[in-house]
Design a protein with these regions (language model features):
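ATPase nucleotide-binding head domains, primarily ABC-like/P-loop NTPase cores
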Residues: 1-170
Length: 170
């Protein structure tokens, strides 16, 4: 998507971003810098493009996906699961769907701060393992946001993953 933007900001002066799917994306930056907005913009534009043939961008080339998976705002199910358990369950659900479909299907996934409900060391390790597992599937594209620089460093020179960083002006 060339110069895509978040539709609810249509009447304002939205920041436009270009998003390509030649490699999977890992986006790092501080809170309130727009990471989640890029995820939402991309998935909204993907759905609009596939369903209606247009979206909120200057131009786009879209190779349709058969499955779109979202890991945003995982609820802490009070009294039942910890946040970490809820996050792990959601990751497993996504992996099960990917694993159980044939390789002709295409999957697009957005992950907003994997395992934010646990300590940084375990979260980083779990996030790295999750990304590593996804890499075995050529039919899966993803955008992942994170605060963990260890995840970014691990995939710094990876052939299927590109790191991005959002700067914040204070």
């Amino acid at each position: 998507f060339d110069k895509q933007y978040y539709p609810p900001l249509c009447g304002e002066n939205p920041v436009c971003n270009t998003c390509t799917f030649s490699k999977n994306m890992i986006i790092s930056s501080p809170n309130k810098s727009g990471k989640t907005t890029i995820l939402k913009s991309t998935v909204i534009n993907l759905i609009f493009s596939q369903q209606f043939g247009y979206g909120f961008y200057k131009s786009a080339f879209v190779n349709p996906y058969t499955h779109i998976h979202s890991y945003i705002n995982i609820p802490d199910t009070s009294g039942r699961d910890s946040l970490f358990q809820a996050e792990s369950r959601r990751c497993k659900e996504i992996l099960d769907i990917i694993h159980d479909t044939d390789c002709d299907t295409r999957h697009f996934c957005i992950f907003d701060e994997l395992y934010s409900g646990t300590n940084p060391v375990e979260a980083s390790n779990a996030g790295n393992a999750f990304i590593q597992y996804l890499q075995q599937y050529n039919n899966v594209n993803f955008i992942l946001t994170t605060h963990y620089t260890s995840i970014c460093k691990k995939y710094k020179n990876h052939k299927r993953v590109q790191n991005y960083k959002m700067d914040v002006i204070i």
